[in-house]
């Protein structure tokens, strides 16, 4: 099965960590749903910052996708990684528009210990990132 171009682009930037490519993949009106923040985060700049932080925390050499369920305009990507000896399992739910830009990105994680660890690690990572993430317009 051929992957839609937004998913191909997502996989490529997960490898390259290219924040300009990530900024180009996100629609201006994108909404990000964090597993540790109860309110949706609105807009490209904040979504870019959260995803940049998540890449720094989760994409640590152990991160890999286990399976993908891909529709016409959305995908569910199940992932696994390990941080500080803790096995983490989660899903990225991604929806895109006619232009192939991501308009909705939701991350769900298990187990509860993983959520608590990610909350701590993401807080540390976000504090180190510049106020405006690179490439955000």
Predicted regions and their residues:
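A short glycine-/small-residue-rich loop at the edge of a beta-strand within enzyme catalytic domains
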Residues: 1, 13, 38-42
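A generic structural signal for ordered secondary structure
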Residues: 2-6, 90-92
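Short hydrophobic/aromatic segments of transmembrane alpha-helices and their interfaces
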Residues: 4, 30-31, 84-85
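Short acidic-aromatic low-complexity motifs
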Residues: 4-25
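Hydrophobic alpha-helical core bundles mediating ligand binding, dimerization, or RNAP-core interactions
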Residues: 7, 26, 51, 77-79
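A solvent-exposed, acidic/Ser-Thr-rich amphipathic alpha-helical stretch
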Residues: 19-72
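A beta-strand edge to alpha-helix "cap/lid" segment located at domain peripheries
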Residues: 55-137
């Amino acid at each position: 099965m051929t992957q839609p171009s937004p998913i191909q682009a997502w996989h490529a930037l997960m490898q390259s960590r290219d924040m300009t490519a990530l900024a180009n993949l996100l629609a201006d009106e994108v909404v990000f749903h964090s597993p540790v923040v109860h309110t949706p985060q609105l807009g490209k700049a904040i979504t870019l910052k959260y995803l940049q932080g998540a890449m720094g925390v989760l994409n640590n050499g152990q991160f890999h996708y286990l399976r993908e369920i891909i529709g016409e305009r959305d995908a569910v990507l199940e992932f696994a990684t390990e941080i500080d000896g803790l096995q983490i399992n989660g899903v990225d739910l991604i929806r895109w528009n006619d232009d192939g830009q991501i308009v909705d990105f939701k991350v769900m994680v298990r187990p509860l210990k993983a959520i608590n660890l990610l909350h701590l690690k993401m807080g540390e990572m976000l504090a180190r990132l510049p106020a405006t993430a690179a490439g955000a317009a």
